[in-house]
Amino acid sequence: MADSLAPVRRANIIGVGLIGGSIALGLREIGWHVTGEDRDPATNALAIELAVLDKIGFDADAEITFVATPVGAVVEAAQRALAASTGVVT
């Protein structure tokens, strides 16, 4: 569990399917604040309902962004994340 005096660590997830959702859940379990988005609005709604994500969108100040999109969308998603983020994009 995260130390309550430590700053909250923040991450982005782009693509909240099986892989992205699993990463998000793992991060949330250890106390990270996770912002994310999926191309499917229904997936976004479900991710909030099931507490997979804390928030829908993109946190430009997150320390890391995980790109978990289908292969054909990786380049565009990574380019957008790199342009909008000050953190690591993987």
Segments (PLM) and residue ranges:
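A broadly tuned preference for mixed-charge, low-complexity surface segments
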Residues: 1-2, 90
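NAD(P)+-binding Rossmann beta1-loop-alpha1 motif at the extreme N-terminus of oxidoreductases
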Residues: 2-56
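Generic enzyme active-site microenvironment
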Residues: 36, 89-90
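Rossmann-like NAD(P)-binding element
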Residues: 58-89
